[in-house]
Amino acid sequence: MKAAETRILELRAELDQHNYRYHVLDEPSIPDAEYDRLFHELKALEAENPHLVTPDSPTQRVGSAALSAFTQVRHEMAMLSLGNAFEENDLREFDRRVTEGLDLPAGDLFGEGGKVQYSCEPKLDGLAVSLLYRDGALVRGATRGDGTTGEDISVNVRTVRNIPLKLQGKGWPELLEVRGEVFMSKAGFERLNASQLEVGGKTFANPRNAAAGSLRQLDSKITANRPLEFCCYGLGQTSAEIADTHIGVLETLKKWGMPVSRELKLADGVEECLAYYRDIGERRLSLTYEIDGVVFKVNNLAAQRELGFRAREPRWAIAHKFPAMEELTELLDVEFQVGRTGAVTPVARLKPVKVAGVMVANATLHNMDEVARLGLMIGDTVIIRRAGDVIPQVVQVVVERRPETAKPVEVPQSCPVCGSHVERTQLIKRSKGKETVTEGAVYRCVGRLACGAQLKQAIIHYVSRRAMDIEGLGDKTIEQLVDEKLIGSPADLYKLKYEQIIDLEGFAEISSNKLLKAIADSRQPTLARFIYALGIPDVGEETAKVLARSLASLDRVKQALPEVLTYLPDVGLEVAYEIHSFFEDEHNRNVIDALLGECGLQLQDQGELGAEFAASTTLEGLIDKLHIPSVGPGAAQKLADRFGTLEAVISADWLDMRQTLPEKQAKSVRDFFDDNANAERARAIEAQLKDFGMHWRSEKKTVEGLPLAGQTWVLTGSLERMSRDVAKEKLESLGAKVSGSVSAKTHTVVAGPGAGSKLTKANELGLTVLDEEALLKRLTELGVAVD
């Protein structure tokens, strides 16, 4: 596995955990600036390696899920977060993208000298909220949540004294959504912590935590007694426009009673933005509230609309974070930690030093490639950085201060936890018909679940909320279970007895019974949750959902060849090999067999192959996926058109091949299939595709003109005269696309006994619904045999 890929996986796992603690628990374990650095690093790595981007990456989404204790609210306009700038050049690059991305008359949006005008305001460190007004009255308050769905905190926002319950003045739209930040001033934070200490209550680490925890209290009386404030920074949905510029919007909102930052300013071009940023940075400590940067937005709203959005953020706004903080210290030692996948990761142990107000004694080193890049030796004087007050990392060695006693950093030959052998990972790639093996950046303990560190992390992942969701099994409890040898694999969780649990620290009768019930309740997971819980390298929550939705059975997932897996959305060859290798491993198979056998797990949602996946194969696509040297999609299409079947391509003689392709490509194809291993591999892929129920689609030109061309059909419930697979095949032979979900674009729904939500939705949408008899009649009318 490449260093970049390994680091991406580490960053995603860490960011997911921090997202959960920040957005769901309101108990962040790291500063926001540290999160920003991790996110920025992940984003940069993914930009350099776009093939490694997956739907489950934190860069593809905002935040985490809303708490179920509050009513969920769907935002009509997504509450997106902002991209970040850490250096002045980042802001200049943002300005360049804005300038080049605009296609409007210069007089409409540029200031003096043709420079884009930006609004400038401090980035408050609080909790983003949405305030919805109807006819001037506050009717709802909501948190951002995951950007799409938040929490209804209406009763709590009403207690924030500077949020108007009724807008002042007149002229406001019938519907107006105001967005802003609820925060706590430095003085208010100090008063709150002092009063909490007096009554023996919980104190807060910083004003942001205090604001978030106060605003999301289930008891609004508690919120009312907290010194919360609000500052608006923009709009969501409105029934009418209220200004042509962002600053105009905020000035209008201020007239209607909304609190707006006193530091709001207009800047002509990027250099004035930088001057504003430097000024605020110098005055940062004297401000009455915490800020972690400055937000710049294109002021002209028409320009904002022209620039639009990316997946996670607007193109017309950016948050310029405060700079890195660095200090010198001594590297005392390098220790090695073992993660869930067995990765043995170096960690720097430092002579404690205060960086940006925080005492730092440890720093990440990522992997041994990073140690080599830095030229790091134990005893060195090193520069530690906390970018934007961030997580500590070693950024440089001061070589001229290296002592004579400095020692090289060496990877342990045996695991520091279990004593098993440590080996360097190997990356196996198949390209142009050949397999190549290269060394990865990661070292791994081969002990697997016999290694206590790996076992603990594997169980923590297995029981997590997005996996098997077994409540009551916290990290400390899992450590006890492993340390006392009560569990040796996830399967052992289902063998735990009441007598074993009640003896654990922190457990009594009620909590023991609750845990046993939670474990028992996890015996019927969805296929997607189970796949995710297995902890397959590179398989996050979204990839697990894709596997479950497309292959629809664990057996197919286990058997799937890497080339077959690449037919799935967003599954590249490297990830496909990781999945295939995981299920090829005998130890992993034994654990899965135990879970599904003696432990009694019953996977839900297994059944027929996903309709879109089943119809996604073409002969030319298969040929292309073989990675024959010099043969791309165009040549693959010519081969499919000429020969019609894979076997005909494999057995084609030189003359036929030369009549189809240029000499170089023809020779490459013949040489490829003359290697018996390649020919057999191709046959195996085709056989598995057919065994799974996939089939070659005709080219679009052959579908046009068929009676059901352009129509989308959905099959739901059971059929008696023919299987759904057969019905699907017959409909597709008539040109129809058979989908697994109902939408407004669906033409006809065939509903048999047991049809559920799909039938309900079809009726709600007023779609044509046929029973089995009507389907058979329709097929017969179109000349398709039904017996």
From Swiss-Prot:
SMART domains: BRCT (SM00292), HhH1 (SM00278), LIGANc (SM00532). PROSITE patterns: BRCT, DNA_LIGASE_N1, DNA_LIGASE_N2. The gene is ligA. GO terms for biological process: DNA repair; DNA replication. DNA ligase that catalyzes the formation of phosphodiester linkages between 5'-phosphoryl and 3'-hydroxyl groups in double-stranded DNA using NAD as a coenzyme and as the energy source for the reaction. It is essential for DNA replication and repair of damaged DNA. PANTHER family: CHROMOSOME TRANSMISSION FIDELITY FACTOR 18, DNA LIGASE. Its EC number is 6.5.1.2. It is an enzyme of class 6 (ligase). This is DNA ligase. Pfam families: BRCT (PF00533), DNA_ligase_aden (PF01653), DNA_ligase_OB (PF03120), HHH_2 (PF12826), HHH_5 (PF14520), Nlig-Ia (PF22745). The active site is at K123. GO terms for cellular component: cytosol. Zn(2+) binds at C415, C418, C445, C451. Belongs to the NAD-dependent DNA ligase family. LigA subfamily. Residues 703-787 form the BRCT domain. Keywords: DNA damage, DNA repair, DNA replication, Ligase, Magnesium, Manganese, Metal-binding, NAD, Zinc. One of its GO terms (molecular function) is DNA ligase (NAD+) activity. Its cofactor is Mg(2+); Mn(2+). It comes from Pseudomonas syringae pv. tomato (strain ATCC BAA-871 / DC3000). InterPro entries: BRCT_dom (IPR001357), BRCT_dom_sf (IPR036420), DisA/LigA_HHH (IPR041663), DNA_ligase (IPR001679), DNA_ligase_AS (IPR018239), DNA_ligase_CS (IPR033136), DNAligase_adenylation (IPR013839), DNAligase_N (IPR013840). NAD(+) binds at D32, A33, E34, Y35, D36, S81, L82, E121, R144, E181, K297, K321. It catalyses: NAD(+) + (deoxyribonucleotide)n-3'-hydroxyl + 5'-phospho-(deoxyribonucleotide)m = (deoxyribonucleotide)n+m + AMP + beta-nicotinamide D-nucleotide.
